[in-house]
Amino acid sequence: MEMMNWERRSLLNELIHGLKAAKQLQGSSSPSLSASSSYLTTEIKENLLHNIVSSFKKAILMLNGSTTQHNPTIELAPDPLAHPGKVPGSPASITGNPRSEEFFNVRSKEFNLSSKKRKMLPKWTEQVRISPERGLEGPHDDIFSWRKYGQKDILGAKFPRSYYRCTFRNTQYCWATKQVQRSDGDPTIFEVTYRGTHTCSQGIPLPEKRETKPKHTVAVNYQNLRASLTVRTGGLGSEAFSFPVTSPLYTYESINGGGTFYHHVGSSGPSDFTGLISTNTSTGSSPIFDVNFQFDPTAEINTGFPTFFHNSI
């Protein structure tokens, strides 16, 4: 930020310097000041002209970005009208540094060298078609950031040519530029001429991001699945698919006063249990089921039956 303020002050001082020298030279040629300006000799006028040209050159160099942080302090030249008998100082004393002219000569050579380097940058042209609603400015939808710095009419062309440079030229020293020219035959076509590749941060490709596909849960429509299933019963007897219709019957008996024994009886007839269950013909005792395995009264019996079993006891 301080650098920008310093460059702005230096540029303003140079412009004021040149304007002041031009006014002094203009006043020396005015008829109303001919008597008081007779002391302005040819040497003084030449110095004033030199100051004007030097100030404009320095201002142009500053605008082109060829100044550095070590620019000399620029001081305004003394006013010859304020000191009639005194000749203005030499160019070295005017700029405040004996090596100022040498410094700007070196800067001018470096500027010429950088201009030659820019001409050696790669150059290519592309044609871009846009909608007519975009106007005369041309396409701006590329991936880079540009700043328009000029526009001029081209001889024999219907539309002007626009000039752009990278936004990060002064901060990252990126020399990429482009020219945009609308086609005379088809106004929707623009010829974009690029010069130089981007060396700034926006010219570095970003690492590719791997796309993670979300896991999708497939919901099965069981109603459609059930409707699409068919059962083929050809060649099968009806006896294989006969199922009991009545609900099962549970009977409970107390064994030796401890625990509960249950047996499941389906809807089949009593003949299915022949040889498996026999009743005790004693009239003084309750009927006890006799099964084909030996029952150990001392064995632990799991009584954790469902609640409806306990409620029915």
UniProtKB/Swiss-Prot annotation:
Coiled coil start-end: none
Keyword entries, A-Z: DNA-binding, Nucleus, Transcription, Transcription regulation
One GO CC term, this protein: nucleus
Pfam families recorded: WRKY (PF03106)
Gene Ontology molecular function terms on file: DNA-binding transcription factor activity; sequence-specific DNA binding
DNA-binding region: 135-203
Subcellular location: Nucleus
Stated role: Transcription factor. Interacts specifically with the W box (5'-(T)TGAC[CT]-3'), a frequently occurring elicitor-responsive cis-acting element.
Family of this protein: Belongs to the WRKY group III family.
Protein name: Probable WRKY transcription factor 41
